Amino acid sequence: MTNVDTTIDYMDQASFLGLRALGHAPVIQWTWIYRRDVDLVGLRRFHHNLGRGLLGRRIERSPLPFGRHRWITCRGPADIAIAPESRSNRDVQAWLDEQAALPIDPEHGPSWRLALQPLIEGGAVVTLVASHTVVDGVGLVIAVTEAATGITRDLDYPAAGSRTKRQALLEDSRAVVRDVPGMAKSLVSTVKMAGKNRADIVSKKPRATSAVVEPTRTVIVPAVTVHVDIEQWDERAASLGGTANSLSLGFAARLGYRLGWVAEDGSVTISVPVNERLPEDNRGNALTAVTLIADPHTVTTDLTGVRSGLKTALTDLADTRNELLAALPLTPLVPRSAARRVEGLVLKSKVIGSSHVGDLDPAANRPDGTDADSFAARMAEHITSDHLRRVGGIFFPLVAGRVHGEVWVSIGFCNADGTTTREQLTEVAVQALADFGMTGTVE
């Protein structure tokens, strides 16, 4: 049996707890479009390598209800899911939505899948969908880049069921005993933090939602991707006193304004994930986050406020990081009802997540070994109409990055009534670009 510590990190266990408590969790979807035939030999090599990197695993639960779960080896699907019939270019987004909606499960599998859709006009679309519990955005960048360049990792995780139930009970019970001092310390810190932030917690007001109650149904959250030439993006950012990253935040603020995703004072709250992944770091989610307030009315002419706000937030994180992570050792003890309440508090706060993965390695745009003509990445999640009404609408975290001479920004949004259309979201994205004096394509 492996001597590697296969215990999942508290952050990953929290993500898994959220999935089981809420019945849904985010997935990350990467998409490549080829305007010529895809090299299936190269793509199958890429698929093989993905299962031998950070994606090649799933979770095996502890037999203890309050135990720590573990990673086990799982290579993923045996082959690429190739659509039997070609579809038109105009159906690409519908196909991507269908792929994002297919079951992905970090415990029962598959925790990821790779699919290909031939196009009537020529070429094909390739998409990779992965559980956010198994890998975060930066982790997926690493997994894809390594797979595309032929690099594999020996994670040395055991196979499913390699421990007998008796063995698992004994090992996990000992682990719980070892964790008790840390849990006690965490409880004290959490109580102190809750007392300090009590005013913020009790002052949360739910957003107004539709009074019409309809039967619940699955909602396809409209999604679009903005593509802008890198030189245009960088020149505009510099002219506004910002950076490529701060322009992404300004763009997020402007989208929030145009979609009505603002606070009572008209400001926009943006949550920015902060990567904490170290070399050879096998955590699924190796990140924290900072929050900043942006004025959507000034970002189109001056990005210095957003830039300095992010810098201040990152500086403050050095002092607040331990406080933010203090409660994580209590994760195995959190009841599902508490997870559902936390979700309600978070989603009703009208925060916009904005993730900028930076410049991708060119290899990340070569799943079959050659450059794709177009690339995008986004967050997606199974959402019901009941969920939308309960939380007052959904604004998926924006995902932005740079590759193949372009900046891309993915946007996913739907109002509480589920009536937002992709055409409306496209119009908003075009208007937000125009607010900054930029042009691009929205697809």
Please describe what each predicted stretch is.
Residues 6, 32-41, 45-52, 59-392, ...:
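Soluble acyl-CoA-dependent acyltransferase catalytic core bearing the H(X)4D motif
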Residues 21, 27, 266-267:
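Long, Pro/Ser/Thr-rich low-complexity/intrinsically disordered regulatory tracts in eukaryotic proteins
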Residues 114-116, 397-400:
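Short amphipathic beta-strand and strand-loop transition segments with alternating hydrophobic
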Residues 2-23:
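N-terminal alpha-helical "arm" segments
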